[in-house]
């Protein structure tokens, strides 16, 4: 009571209540902050778990796609190996058949040479086919390695995208460990299933091809010696060998599986029904065997080309599946795929060129003996049965010699005297009528020849030209009437003066007309003509 003695009765001590209120406020604020912190932690944990779940879901999808691609690539590789082994075995069987057939045809050297050429071309084709298979193997993508000691597992493509989220990993390490364990278990189970499928396919392949491995190794050596491996291909082969799990070595007891499990991808050979076979009817048996060999070689070429086409189709389908996951694959895989496609196209073109060349050679070989067969001379039937062939040849030679001598004598200038004529001998006796007719004919010929000589010797008379006759006429007319008409006559004379070269008959007629006119004028008028100059001669004198 002493403490509160100084306090008045009506007053209340508020300090006590204030302290209690402050304590309650502090408790409430602390509880609120604790709740907020718990909510923040829960939200962060939920976000972290969601991110981890999403990341591991993406990783699981990516791993599943890669595992599927790898299994498909391994299956393709095994299928290609089976086709290689099948082709090599088939080639060996055909070689054995050819060797057995060649023993029957050893007497024909040309056929032996053609068979050696065919076997060498077959070996080249088989090497080229194995080379194309080796080059065309698809390269599987690299499987990411899982390290047991690391809790945080991320691929190379995800590290670049998750650099800004490292603080989330540190917070969510404990809840994500369980999820990672589950994912690792799933991955191990999927890898075991893929490895079991691989081991089953390997076992079936090895069970069916145990006897052919030696041949495939020899063909592989041939291909490796022909095609030098680049450092990129070596790295890829190392990755392939490291990517295969060790579980394939465990199941070796299943090698007794039948060969029917391996799919047979070899195409059916179409029957060669060509019009060239109709030419084989009239050929000897040796040529028939040779043509059969050539047809077998052409079939082998077609089968190899079709097998390569089927392999290219399988690889294209695998590439289409791989294209869906190209966002995760690096650019180097795209470049490798382009290189593989180019190499496949080149191999296909080479095989087609070889096929065309072989077809051309086969056609030439078929046409060659036929030409020789038709070039043989046919037997000419005898036309002259009275003489033997030797006598006929001698007669022909003698005739040719005589003909040459006669032609040589005919070409000489004095050949008429040398060649005997029948007209030189005594003529046959004729009847009297024929003799009289011959004498009359000879007399007529003599008279004609004398007349011809006389006509040739006659010279033309002077003053018989037309111009001279006209001048003479006008001169005479001027003597008779010296009137103005004379001028007109002179003008006409000047007009006619250039016309010369008339015939003798026309000049003669003009001369006669002038003569008659002159005589008429002389008798009628009685004029006396003056004497002419001595150098002028008239036509009628």
Swiss-Prot record:
Biased composition (Acidic residues): 152-161
Coiled coil (UniProt feature): 382-459
Pfam family, one: Hmw_CFAP97
Amino acid composition bias (Low complexity), ranges on this chain: 176-201
Residue positions, PTM Phosphothreonine: 155
Transmembrane portions of the chain: none
Region (Disordered), start-end ranges: 28-47, 93-296, 313-337, 406-430, 495-514
Tissues and organs where the protein is expressed, per its UniProt entry: Highly expressed in testis with lower levels detected in other tissues including lung, heart and kidney.
Record keywords, A-Z: Coiled coil, Phosphoprotein
Modified residues (Phosphoserine): 8, 19, 160-161, 230, 258
Biased composition (Basic and acidic residues): 35-47, 93-107, 142-151, 207-218, 287-296
Bias (Polar residues) ranges: 219-232, 240-250, 267-277, 503-513
Family recorded in the similarity comment: Belongs to the CFAP97 family.
PANTHER family noted in UniProt: CILIA- AND FLAGELLA-ASSOCIATED PROTEIN 97, CILIA- AND FLAGELLA-ASSOCIATED PROTEIN 97-RELATED
Identification of the protein by name: Cilia- and flagella-associated protein 97
């Amino acid at each position: 009571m002493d403490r509160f003695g100084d306090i008045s009765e009506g007053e209340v001590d508020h300090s006590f209540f204030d302290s209690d209120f402050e304590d309650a406020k502090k408790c409430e604020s602390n509880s609120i902050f604790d709740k907020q912190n718990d909510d923040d932690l829960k939200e962060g944990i939920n976000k972290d778990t969601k991110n981890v779940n999403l990341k591991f879901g993406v990783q699981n999808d990516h791993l599943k796609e890669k595992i599927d691609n790898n299994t498909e690539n391994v299956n393709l590789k095994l299928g290609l190996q089976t086709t290689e082994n099948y082709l090599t075995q088939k080639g060996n069987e055909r070689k054995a058949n050819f060797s057995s057939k060649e023993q029957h045809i050893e007497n024909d050297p040309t056929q032996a040479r053609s068979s050696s050429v065919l076997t060498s071309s077959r070996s080249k084709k088989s090497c080229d086919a194995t080379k194309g298979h080796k080059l065309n193997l698809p390269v599987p993508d690299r499987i990411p390695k899982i390290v047991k000691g690391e809790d945080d597992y991320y691929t190379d493509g995800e590290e670049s995208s998750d650099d800004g989220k490292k603080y989330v990993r540190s917070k969510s390490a404990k809840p994500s460990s369980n999820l990672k364990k589950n994912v690792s278990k799933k991955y191990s189970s999927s890898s075991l299933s893929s490895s079991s499928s691989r081991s089953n396919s390997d076992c079936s392949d090895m069970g069916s091809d145990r006897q052919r491995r030696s041949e495939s190794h020899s063909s592989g050596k041939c291909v490796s010696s022909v095609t030098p491996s680049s450092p990129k291909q070596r790295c890829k082969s190392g990755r392939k060998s490291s990517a295969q799990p060790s579980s394939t070595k465990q199941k070796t007891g299943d090698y007794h599986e039948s060969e029917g499990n391996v799919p047979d991808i070899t195409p059916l050979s179409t029957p060669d029904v060509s019009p060239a076979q109709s030419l084989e009817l009239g050929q000897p048996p040796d040529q028939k065997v040779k043509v059969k060999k050539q047809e077998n070689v052409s079939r082998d070429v077609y089968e190899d080309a079709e097998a390569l086409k089927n392999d290219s189709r399988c690889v294209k389908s695998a590439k289409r599946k791989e294209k869906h996951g190209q966002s995760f694959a690096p650019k180097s895989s795209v470049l490798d795929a382009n290189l593989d496609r180019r190499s496949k196209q080149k191999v296909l073109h080479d095989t087609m060129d070889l096929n065309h060349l072989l077809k051309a050679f086969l056609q030439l070989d078929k046409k060659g003996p036929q030409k020789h067969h038709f070039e043989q001379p046919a037997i000419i039937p005898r036309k002259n049965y009275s003489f033997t062939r030797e006598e006929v040849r001698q007669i022909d030679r003698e005739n040719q010699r005589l003909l040459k001598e006669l032609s040589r004598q005919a070409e000489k200038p004095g050949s008429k005297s040398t060649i005997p004529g029948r007209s030189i001998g005594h003529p046959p006796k004729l009847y009297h009528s024929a003799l009289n007719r011959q004498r009359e004919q000879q007399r007529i010929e003599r008279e004609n020849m004398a007349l011809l000589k006389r006509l040739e010797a006659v010279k033309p008379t002077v003053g018989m030209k037309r111009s001279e006759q006209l001048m003479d006429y006008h001169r005479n007319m001027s003597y008779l009437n010296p009137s103005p008409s004379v001028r007109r006559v002179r003008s006409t004379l000047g007009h006619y003066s250039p016309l010369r070269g008339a015939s003798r008959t026309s000049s003669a007629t003009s001369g006669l007309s002038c003569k008659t006119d002159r005589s008429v004028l002389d008798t009628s008028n009685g004029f006396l003509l003056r004497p002419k100059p001595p150098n002028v001669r008239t036509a009628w004198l």
